[in-house]
């Protein structure tokens, strides 16, 4: 749940460092072996093997608690409960790039920074009604599948405290500039840890944008109990074939994960195919 395409970043941090220093006992034994011949060499090997190196390794420990623990437990529940299957595809994005360039001046006049995310959100909201299993959840206790009739999309945001997923409600009923302003506000407040609990609940589908820091494809973990999540790779120019010729063209890698108990592979493939239509030429969003 990862982001030079839209608004979110997916920074990765390393928390463990290792350093080693020579063990004095082993060094002394080795020197003895060098001067005393082969029997001493055998003793040197034994002493080196028995040497305790735990106090020579530097390990930094951090508490596993708070937001990090909450994220970890949610990820584990999702991975261990829902059998994940992923579908990867690439959307032609020349029309998307052009549409954003044409609308950016208007957005700036309104004081709104327009990214690609609102376009993707609108495209997802346009496609989901045709694939209701992607906007659902499984109620195991009741033995029922719940199909949502509203389209509340979570947007994964990387923060210093960990991954947060603020929710934009009723995406299908909002315009691009309204969505852009709302997403920008949620992202900023997520990074400042100013979101309310209500703003992190109620999503029916999630988008994560790992491509903002580079990369193409991944396997997004479901924001359980949702049955679908869309991961975005880096939108950039790549070699594409047009009329038998290799040319440079903007493309957007797509990675979709599903709860395979509810969603069939053919459904996720169809979802991606229709999504590509809207991303290739966003004018279809006006229909």
PLM regions: where:
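C-terminal catalytic/motor cores of large multi-domain enzyme assemblies
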Residues: 2, 6-16, 20-39, 43-287
């Amino acid at each position: 749940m990862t982001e030079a395409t839209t608004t979110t970043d997916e920074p990765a941090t390393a928390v463990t460092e290792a350093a080693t220093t020579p063990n004095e006992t082993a060094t002394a034994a080795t020197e003895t072996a060098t001067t005393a011949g082969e029997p001493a060499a055998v003793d040197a090997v034994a002493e080196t093997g028995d040497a305790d190196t735990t106090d020579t390794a530097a390990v930094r420990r951090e508490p596993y608690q708070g937001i990090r623990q909450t994220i970890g437990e949610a990820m584990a529940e999702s991975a261990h409960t829902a059998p994940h299957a992923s579908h990867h595809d690439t959307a032609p994005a020349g029309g998307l790039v052009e549409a954003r360039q044409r609308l950016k001046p208007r957005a700036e006049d309104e004081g709104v920074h327009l990214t690609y995310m609102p376009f993707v959100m609108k495209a997802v909201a346009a496609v989901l009604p045709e694939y209701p299993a992607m906007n659902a959840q499984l109620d195991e206790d009741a033995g029922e599948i719940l199909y949502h009739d509203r389209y509340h999309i979570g947007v994964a945001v990387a923060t210093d405290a960990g991954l947060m997923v603020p929710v934009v409600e009723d995406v299908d009923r909002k315009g691009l500039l309204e969505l852009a302003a709302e997403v920008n506000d949620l992202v900023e407040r997520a990074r400042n840890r100013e979101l309310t609990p209500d703003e992190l609940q109620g999503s029916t589908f999630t988008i994560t944008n790992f491509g903002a820091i580079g990369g193409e494809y991944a396997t997004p973990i479901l924001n359980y109990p949702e049955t679908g999540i869309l991961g975005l790779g880096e939108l950039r120019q790549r070699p594409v074939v047009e009329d038998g010729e290799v040319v440079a063209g903007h493309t957007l890698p797509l990675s979709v994960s599903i709860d395979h108990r509810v969603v069939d592979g053919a459904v996720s493939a169809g979802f991606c195919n229709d999504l590509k239509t809207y991303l290739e030429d966003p004018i279809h969003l006006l229909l």
